[in-house]
């Protein structure tokens, strides 16, 4: 098979591992920077070009689109989809998961456990917004933030008011969530592939930090999931419409709550913590489903 990996970083661990796994299984693979692509959108033969050349035919595409290039990257992915190329994760699922507020609303509609979340536009609504999520301490999140950037723990009501007023004054899009104190700075990353959770790790924040992201200095260890946690992770990924997802859960007093569904989960932390060959599992999943897609199109 001829496989395209949409990624700006050919030297990133996840991209390199996917290339290695694809080559090991006998595939031809090309890493494509979506920002260097341009598209011919027409009714007879849509195409994707780069540096003056048509990229030609691919059997499957694995999107590893960074959050900062979601709009253009998704447009390139849609063009692949229009051309009949099997996408391991589709453009619609990626767009849903990248919009933090929309993803919370979709999960809420499906009755999936969430932290109480508030969203408002006017500074005059701040007092009610704080009360809505149970008061301080609370968490303020920039909707465009990634890897723990733009996430603030407001430990007092006064601090919460100040942070919210500052963000609103900057016209930033923010949401407010209850603080799950009982999680003690730890979350669980569930790696979903198709209809299975193939790996899971517990991420613990470093001392004095509440964000458990590995990019923020958190540590990762193997964790055993409960049946409920496994079910919640699978339902969350399905709700987003994703075949590959990193579902982040917190263990709360009222069961697992979903913090985020990541459509481009990193492989380094999960592979090292679990000793599982996640990259190979992704390529095997892609082979199976791309072949189904080709047969159904014939």
Swiss-Prot record:
Positions contributing to Mg(2+) 1 binding: 248, 260
Class in the EC hierarchy, top level: ligase
Residues at which ATP binds: 141, 178-179, 187, 211-213
Positions bound to Mn(2+) 2: 260, 262
Domain ATP-grasp stretches: 104-287
Record key words, sorted: ATP-binding, Ligase, Magnesium, Manganese, Metal-binding, Nucleotide-binding, Protein biosynthesis
Cofactor(s) demanded: Mg(2+); Mn(2+)
Cross-referenced InterPro entries: ATP-grasp, ATP-grasp_RimK-type, ATP_grasp_subdomain_1, RimK, Rimk_N, Rp_bS6_RimK/Lys_biosynth_LsyX
Signal peptide: none
GO terms assigned for molecular function: ATP binding; metal ion binding; ribosomal S6-glutamic acid ligase activity
Residues given in the record as Mg(2+) 2 binding sites: 260, 262
Keyword Signal assigned: no
Sites where the protein binds Mn(2+) 1: 248, 260
Cofactor note: Binds 2 magnesium or manganese ions per subunit.
Protein family: Belongs to the RimK family.
GO cellular component, one term: cytoplasm
Single GO BP term: translation
Organism per entry: Shewanella frigidimarina (strain NCIMB 400)
EC number: 6.3.2.-
Name of the protein described by the UniProt record: Probable alpha-L-glutamate ligase 2
Keyword Membrane on entry: no
Pfam families listed in its UniProt record: RimK (PF08443), Rimk_N (PF18030)
Top-rank taxon, per record: Bacteria
């Amino acid at each position: 098979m001829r496989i395209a990996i949409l990624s700006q970083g050919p030297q990133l661990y996840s991209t390199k591992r996917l290339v290695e796994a694809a080559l090991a299984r006998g595939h031809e693979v090309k890493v494509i920077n979506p920002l260097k692509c341009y598209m011919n959108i027409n009714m007879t033969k849509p195409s994707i070009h780069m540096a003056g050349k048509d990229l030609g035919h691919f059997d499957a595409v694995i999107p590893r689109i960074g959050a900062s290039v979601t709009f253009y990257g998704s447009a390139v992915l849609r063009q692949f989809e229009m051309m009949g190329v099997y996408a391991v994760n589709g453009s619609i699922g990626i767009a849903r998961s990248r919009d933090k507020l929309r993803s919370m609303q979709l999960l809420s509609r499906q009755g999936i456990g969430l932290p109480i979340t508030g969203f408002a536009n006017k500074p005059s609504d701040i007092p009610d917004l704080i009360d809505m999520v149970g008061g301080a301490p609370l968490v303020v999140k920039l909707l465009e933030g990634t890897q723990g950037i733009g996430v603030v723990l407001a430990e007092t009501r006064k601090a919460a008011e100040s942070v919210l007023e500052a963000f609103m004054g900057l016209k930033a899009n923010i949401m407010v969530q209850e603080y799950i104190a009982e999680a003690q700075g730890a979350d669980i990353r569930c790696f979903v592939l198709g209809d299975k959770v193939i790996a899971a790790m517990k991420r613990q924040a470093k001392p004095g930090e509440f964000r458990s992201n590995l990019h923020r200095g958190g540590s990762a260890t193997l964790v055993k999931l409960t049946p409920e946690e496994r079910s919640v992770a699978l339902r969350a990924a399905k709700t987003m419409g994703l075949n590959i997802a990193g579902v982040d859960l917190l263990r709360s007093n009222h069961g697992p709550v979903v913090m985020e569904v990541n459509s481009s989960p990193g492989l380094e932390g999960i592979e090292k913590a679990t000793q599982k060959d996640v990259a190979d599992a992704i390529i095997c999943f892609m082979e199976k489903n791309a072949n189904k897609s080709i047969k159904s199109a014939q």
